[in-house]
Amino acid sequence: NDWTTATGKQVHLSLCFNPSHLEFVNPVATGRVRARQDLMGDTKRTRSMAVLIHGDAAFIGEGVVQETLNLSRVPGYTVGGTLHIIVNNQIGFTTRPNEGRSSMYATSVAKMLPAPIFHVNGEDPEAVAQCVLLALEFRARYQLDVVIDMYGYRRLGHNESDEPTFTQPVLYRRIAERKSVREGYLEHLLKLGEVTRAEADQIATHRQTLLEQNLAEARSEPGTQLKFERSKKWKNYFGGPEPTEETATGVDKQKLAALLEAQTRLPDDFHPHPKIVRWLAARKKMAREEHALDWAAAESLAFATLALEGVRIRLSGEDSGRGTFSHRHAVLHDYENGQLYT
């Protein structure tokens, strides 16, 4: 969805599909942001960012949160900082905080990073807004994750069929007696003289009328099949029930030999490991058909031919540079000074 700001700037908002598996969407969302940054050449990480919304019990309880935080400053994964917003209901379904974690705060896991953590009262909309602005300024300046822990409460049950007073009767009696956030904020504005109750009621009535009109229109219109058009980045991706035609993927032998030979050349000032010297010599023999290709050489040629056609090649994870079985050596380390050569 594209949104025009008050200053006339366009902002594209993309919402990821969030599965019922809590927090699984985190690496998906940050991965999409990183892919977008790479495609745009946004090496400064200023043109797009990730906003992740969490629950308090899930943020401290799900391991994928820690894994995502751990990768936030790793060069191959960083997105220049993510804004984490925890909607802290102080309960996880029926589980109280002291039953679901050993730390005082749900945000304790974020202390593994040099990231600020803002605890803010969710019943104070202006304080929440100030926190968000401060968090965005920090992220823009320091390119680090920021966490906002917004304290609130769940007025109703976990879902439509949940009866919260079965397990938290005292808490939910107090919640039932408490004014809504809107009423509490309205009283604050009335004391400041910023608005009259009649004006506030008029705003609320107007918004409610608009919502009811939109709902009525949605219910009255016949169901239609939405037409989905892929953006230009996805135009060449297609699928369907029918098998695709067989595509010729072969490459000329001379071109393969030249690519394999090119992979054995190193800068004049690079000092390879003694065993790498022998490994490179074996590759040269393969290029000259003096030695049979092995699986690792075939893999490197597959990558090389794709790269030659302008296809981006990205390998990530432990040992992806050298290869788990010392077979790939896509990234070499200078034996004397440790400098990298890809």
Please state what every model-predicted region is.
Residues 144-146, 152-342:
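Flexible, glycine-rich loop/tail regions that form catalytic "lids" or insertion modules at the edges
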Residues 25, 29, 65, 129-133, ...:
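Short, hydrophobic/amphipathic alpha-helical packing segments
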Residues 51-54, 60-62, 85-88, 118-121, ...:
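Generic beta-strand/beta-sheet core signal
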Residues 34-41, 71-73, 106, 134-137, ...:
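Generic recognition of flexible, low-complexity loop/linker segments
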Residues 1-114, 118, 328, 332-342:
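Cofactor-binding active-site loop characterized by glycine-rich and histidine/acidic residues
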Residues 64-68, 109, 130-135, 206:
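Alpha-helical scaffold elements adjacent to nucleotide-binding pockets in ATP/GTP-utilizing enzyme cores
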Residues 92-103, 111-147, 151-157, 161, ...:
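Conserved phosphate-handling catalytic cores of large alpha/beta enzymes
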Residues 6, 105-131, 178-199:
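Conserved thiamine diphosphate
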